[in-house]
Amino acid sequence: MSVKVKDLLKMSRLSQEYGDKVLLEKEIKTSDISRPGLEMTGYFDFYTPERIQLIGMKEWSYLMKMSSHNRHQVLLKMFQPETPVVIIARNLEIPKEMIDAADEKQVAILRSKASTSRLSGEISSYLDSRLAERTSVHGVLMDIYGMGVLIQGDSGIGKSETGLELVKRGHRLVADDRVDIYAKDEVTLWGEPAEILRHLLEIRGVGIIDVMSLYGASAVKDSSQVQIAVYLENYDTQKTFDRLGNDTEELEVAGVRIPRIRIPVKTGRNISVVIEAAAMNYRAKQMGYDATKIFEERLTDLISRNEVKHD
């Protein structure tokens, strides 16, 4: 997914100080951000002009101590055609020489009131998520009690219908049919809908419905962490399904593994309620409460007491 300079302006902390529509269309190709401290001294041997250049109090103070001529020369070297944007933190004053260099090299300038370190973290996090490689999977992504649950299964098993029932029960739809997933870091998956399918659900026999229009803004969510996967499959008497919850299965997406639960589907089962319980049970395990272990402890204790009685 490409990110353009104009996309940064959607962040409430940034305002445009220099640059026309053409400059705002420049692509940002890396999430790395440069703090051009050494460059201010004239050392450009390992300069990376393709990065966003972020100027904070230290860089600005050094720059302002220079003569107007030297300041202009340094900024001309720092502003390159491949530089996507220069950002000024702490709402610092923008010297005339910087505007002149930006005009000559055609580089946009943005400014923010935020501190340099906080601004750097926010922009890096935003770019990491936008520039991360996406993996598309078939399924329905729901936010259930704050847990991101990916519902998968064979075509026609009832994934979208289950998603609709969960929406009616107060949960939120993130994506239906195609879920775009990316690794936010080494252990965290994040999912979002394809833009053309945002807020939409396809129900066989009914067609496409707009969940936001029918159920309101509280029924949808633009993105969510993916914490657990649920796989729906037809009930088979010849197949053994996990009854205690101690059989661990995992789904790997984008190099990150998450737990996956297989749920048999047959007439009379309320699948949406089962998925709710699965989400709450997973959260309980994350908080250190494992019903399976408690059952095993009770069973072991009962067996021990029975053995004592027989002795």
Curated annotation (Swiss-Prot):
Both phosphorylation and phosphorolysis are carried out by the same active site and suggest a common mechanism for both reactions. This is HPr kinase/phosphorylase. ATP binds at residues 153-160. It comes from Streptococcus sanguinis (strain SK36). The gene is hprK. Its cofactor is Mg(2+). Belongs to the HPrK/P family. Gene3D superfamilies: HprK N-terminal domain-like, P-loop containing nucleotide triphosphate hydrolases. GO terms for biological process: regulation of carbohydrate metabolic process. The keyword Transport does not apply. Keywords: ATP-binding, Carbohydrate metabolism, Kinase, Magnesium, Metal-binding, Multifunctional enzyme, Nucleotide-binding, Serine/threonine-protein kinase, Transferase. Homohexamer.
